[in-house]
Amino acid sequence: MERFLLKANYTPKGDQPKAIKELTEGIEKGLKMQTLLGVTGSGKTFTMANVIANVNKPTLVIAPNKTLAAQLCAEFREFFPENAVEYFVSYYDYYQPEAYLPATDTYIEKDSAINDEIDKLRHSATAALFERRDVIIVASVSCIYGLGDPQEYRELLLSVRKGQIYEREAILRKLVDIQYERNEYDLTRGKFRVRGDVIEVFPASYTDRAVRIELFGDEVDRILEFDTLTGEIIGELKHVAIFPASHFATSKEKLERAIKSIEEELEERLRYFEERGKLLEAQRLKQRTLYDIEMLREVGYTKGIENYSRHLTGRKPGEPPYTLIDYFPKDFLMIIDESHITIPQIRGMYEGDRSRKEALVEYGFRLPSAFDNRPLKFHEFEARINQVVFVSATPGPYELKHSQKIVEQIIRPTGLVDPEVEVRPTRGQVDDLYGEIKERVARNERVLVTTLTKKMAEDLTEYFREMGVKVRYLHSDIDTLERVEILRDLRLGVFDVLVGINLLREGLDLPEVSLVAILDADKEGYLRSERSLIQTIGRAARNVNGKVIMYADTVTASMQKAIDETNRRRKLQMEYNRKHGITPQTVQKAVRDVIEATRAVTAELPEVKRDFIQKMSAKEFKQYVEKLTREMKEAAKALEFEKAAMLRDLIIELRAQKAVKK
């Protein structure tokens, strides 16, 4: 049986050993729900990795958004280089759901752009679950949305062995049945081509490799794996399993049954409209559905096939859909990261989906069975949990109520303590903050400032810019990739101060940040609740000089609770440090691009050890940077722009480290 092999250059420290032991024991005793209450920067991901390695179960990790899922996936891949760590998020770069607005008689057709890279990763994830047990899938909440029947997906796979008797025509028919497209010129993912007795297939779950099946008569003579770009042979295989190119692929018999079932529902629905005199709706539904049926008959696929998923999988009306969770074996482990955000998200998915579809069904754009192409309801999601660990610095009411064990991880491995929190009056707050910023910039540290309104954030950014501060404003219109670049530039010192409204969003745990300023801290609301304030305070917890200033004229109940909880943790941490003679150190974290988490192959970069850099003489350091600069220019000349950009960032980071050391 495959085991998880955890690779790390460090061992559990602080509260990690206790948390790992308690959570592992809880899982082995069969506890269904546990919570890891881990403060920011306490190494919760490393604790999770150790628990996964100990219990050795296939694991689903659910994160609240794509960016956080990408970060977690990158970290788990570093911890488990020999195991299958997969990424499963919504494959839409852009998604406009199908909708109808009766007030203006406006039909909005579904419009989307599918990210081929993410679609490949989704196929890779489901294929891994059928091929091995040492699998970790990091997913967003999209994992509770409908997917094809896992049993059908497994049964439809094309299995080819060397020496097997398999007619050429039978292989080709099978490939078409499982939604592979024949294309003699363009061999890309989900396509195949034929040259005499040689069949070349690019499996849906592969990145840059394809499979060549060589036949001798009806016997499989050789199976080769080759590079799709260069044609170079990578190796010879004894067996290959090619999974369907679509999660909604279905067998001929089931497709016929599904079409019959769709036709019956259509007849019934047309009667319903005609009896009520809704002839326009009846005509619309008939035209659209008959077209879809024709497409299903001819090519086994149609745009919006997911709306017929109930018929294709043979489910009864109202029955929950199959989801990624159904692809896992029964004894799997679930970890819900940032559970205080993720659980409410899961809870709200069904209602949002239902309300949008009601108009589509009522006005004849879709059959009522479209309601069954939906995310899981919360009670259905609960029923699919085998064992779960909720992970959060501020667990929500659901986790606190249902967990059979709550494990605290307060002590950080670095010895860092929670930041000191100070409340200052709002009068003269901007000038006071400017003085604090100047201090931090002089020490090569960074500052986060959170405001309550867009106008305040914009005005503050403009004012600081006029005062000569290198400042950026992080607003909600910025897309995910641009956010990642802004955060990277903040870490590299391209600018020093980041102003934003919601600093609770992902990726803002930056070790260079030594000051978090909270303006209007006494205005009660979502962003100034106890839980939000504790999360915001945690943004300064990765730096040894971490400090939080709340600007407020009164101390609200939320502020007091957040300050009290921070002081409780701070006291425990300081006592532990005193007892064990630990001197806190700022977290040392490489500026790694989280965008790379979703790429299977990244540019090869030299692994740089900080202590190695600091021991270099000025001359050695200069020569090393010159070498990297040459490599960067060569990469740019060879059109390897990603590698060149990564080398550029590495050079900036190294120079910054050397400057700090001086």
Swiss-Prot record:
Annotated UVR domain residues: 622-657
One Gene Ontology cellular component annotation held by this UniProt entry: cytoplasm
Annotated protein name in UniProt: UvrABC system protein B
Record keyword ATP-binding present: yes
Described function: The UvrABC repair system catalyzes the recognition and processing of DNA lesions. A damage recognition complex composed of 2 UvrA and 2 UvrB subunits scans DNA for abnormalities. Upon binding of the UvrA(2)B(2) complex to a putative damaged site, the DNA wraps around one UvrB monomer. DNA wrap is dependent on ATP binding by UvrB and probably causes local melting of the DNA helix, facilitating insertion of UvrB beta-hairpin between the DNA strands. Then UvrB probes one DNA strand for the presence of a lesion.
Species of the source: Carboxydothermus hydrogenoformans (strain ATCC BAA-161 / DSM 6008 / Z-2901)
A matching Pfam family: ResIII
Residues reported in the UniProt entry to bind ATP: 38-45
Entry coiled-coil feature ranges: none
Residues in Helicase C-terminal domain copies: 429-595
HAMAP family: UvrB
Residues annotated as domain Helicase ATP-binding: 25-412
Family: Belongs to the UvrB family.
NCBIfam families: PRK05298.1, uvrb
Keyword entries, A-Z: ATP-binding, Cytoplasm, DNA damage, DNA excision, DNA repair, Excision nuclease, Nucleotide-binding, SOS response
Residue numbers covered by motif Beta-hairpin: 91-114
Main location: cytoplasm
Key word Electron transport present: no
Subunit details: Forms a heterotetramer with UvrA during the search for lesions. Interacts with UvrC in an incision complex.
Localization (cell): Cytoplasm
Any GO BP: nucleotide-excision repair
Single GO MF descriptor: DNA binding
Entry note about domains: The beta-hairpin motif is involved in DNA binding.
